[in-house]
Amino acid sequence: GKLRIIIGNKELVYSEIKNDYELNRPKELPADFDWNSTYGLYMQGKDWLNQKMYGNAEKYLKAALEKDVYFIPALVSLSSLYYKKGMYLDACELVKRVLSLDTYHGEANYLYGLCSRAMGNLADAKDGFSVATFSPGFRTAAYEQLGELYMREENWEKAEQYALKSLEYNQMNLYAKQLLIVLYRKSNHAEKALSEIEKMTEQLPLLHWVRFEEYLLEASTAEEFSSLICNELSFETYMEMAV
């Protein structure tokens, strides 16, 4: 017979029965697929992008666009790559090409917002993030970005509104929680900030920026904050928080 071992409430299962673990997902590339087609070149570029081999990714994505200058998946991926490289103007030009065809494309609008923000075009940034909120995959991040923009303008009410909207769609969005704590501190709502900090330290006690925010509100917690940063290269932790 075949052996099956179950430990606890199926916390660990070992089985010799093939149907318990064998999957039907395709495991081989199709032999008749044209890897030199527009989509084939894009897929190769996307694969290199996932591996963070950006030089190869750029090569194949550009090759795909040589065949079709309006191939949206390649435009979006290459725009994302250029944004990561700090080539904001180039990234923005590519993503504008997408928006000229599909004005509600979620990722394209989000990238448009990021590039516009990086170049200081805040009205365009708000425009891009606002339209990106229509897409569920980018909604929580786009709301958080809008909150950051309004906090920069010291529009505390709108910043809070967008931070809370972001958390409605993803309660564990740490960027939105950080935004909420920072804006409460900067708008002199220390009690609200400390309340959010308390919730965060219960959930993630080693999230150092939370304890730093607590220190900014209560200087007496300085020793407690620094005592928990005890990794080998502790200066890197401080530098990451500063950035």
Please identify what each model-predicted range represents.
Residues 1-36:
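Long, contiguous interaction/recruitment modules in multidomain scaffold/adaptor proteins
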Residues 34-67, 237-241:
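Alpha-helical segment of the N-proximal tetratricopeptide repeat
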Residues 71, 105, 139, 173, ...:
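Residue-level recognition of tetratricopeptide repeat
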Residues 74, 108, 142, 176, ...:
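TPR alpha-solenoid repeat register
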